[in-house]
Each structure stands twice: as C-alpha cells, then as structure tokens.
Amino acid sequence: MVNSMPKPFLTPGTLYCGAAPAVISTVLGSCVAVCLIDRHNRAAGMNHFVLPHNPAGEDSLRYGDVALDRLHARMGELGCETKDLRAKVFGGAAVLPFGATGDSVGTKNVKIAIEWLHAQGIPTLARRTGGENGLLIRFYTATGRVLVRTIQSAITIDLGGISPAFDSRQSPFFQE
C-alpha cells in the first residue's frame, strides 16, 4: 500500500536506496536525478546531484561523479549486479545563467550522467532532461514508474504528505 511505504524527499547532495517499496521524490532545476532499478533483486535507488564534478576532488554527493559511483555502490550492497540495472534520468534544465560560450550547468550534469551510465553498460530506459523548467519527480520503486510534473517558475509546490529527508544516520538514506 502506497500510504504505508517510506516517502523520502531528496534534497541536493543526497541519495536513497532500498529493497522495500518506496516513493522517492525530489524537485530538480539544473540538478539531475538518476533512478536505478533492479527488478530481479527488487531494489531501487535515486540520487540528486548539483554539479557534474568538483575540480578540487571533494568527496561529496553534491557532485555527479561521486553521486553516481555511490548510488551504484549502494545498489551493489543490496545485491544488485550492474548487468541487471536499468536507469532513468531527469533534470538538467537551463535555469541558471551561463556565459555565451559553453554548456549550461544542467547540460553538463546530464552529460556526465549519460556518459557514466554508458561507461557502466547500464541501459537508460527513460529520460526527461533539459528545457527551461524545473521538474517534480516521484519514483515508485516497486514498479519503476516515475511521475514527472513540470514546475513553472514562481509557483508554490505542495508536496502533499511527502516526508522531508531522513536523518543522515538512518539507513538507507545518505546525506552529506
């Protein structure tokens, strides 16, 4: 039953993985969320990262290279094998200003996610990336379905019963 399952809300720089059914939610602008699911092991997870990588090498889930590796590792701890994983990628909107040359932060975030998944051999089943509007994402881990709602600028969002992020000491949620 959906009402009794965990409903973690991911803030930037967090991830959630588990084998029990959950509804994982987040709100994205230029940030990216990658959802991984292993139907064989009935495990799933999602991250929410802010920037593609940190040139200083900071070990933080706010950076895509770290967040993707950690999500993959956590899925492995749940018994998942890379060959059984499937991905869905969301976010990366051009909501932050950037110079006339080069890609936006959102574009760079999407690029690192897609390249990382390709390098791992993890198929991407769905993708809603880019654009100019934010997204509200709800990932139903039991089925792998994702509800995506477009967020227009300057609106208030009622998250309707979604719990705020868990304390970072609670498993299976990680926050830095």
From Swiss-Prot:
One Pfam family named in its UniProt record: CheD
GO biological process: chemotaxis
InterPro entries in the cross-refs: CheD-like_sf, Chemorcpt_Glu_NH3ase_CheD, Cytotoxic_necrot_fac-like_cat
Reaction(s) the record says it catalyses: L-glutaminyl-[protein] + H2O = L-glutamyl-[protein] + NH4(+)
Class of enzymatic activity (EC top level): hydrolase
EC number(s) stated in the UniProt entry for this protein: 3.5.1.44
Keywords: Chemotaxis, Hydrolase
GO molecular function: protein-glutamine glutaminase activity
Family of this protein: Belongs to the CheD family.
Function noted in UniProt: Probably deamidates glutamine residues to glutamate on methyl-accepting chemotaxis receptors (MCPs), playing an important role in chemotaxis.
Protein name: Probable chemoreceptor glutamine deamidase CheD
Phylogenetic lineage: Bacteria, Pseudomonadati, Pseudomonadota, Alphaproteobacteria, Rhodospirillales
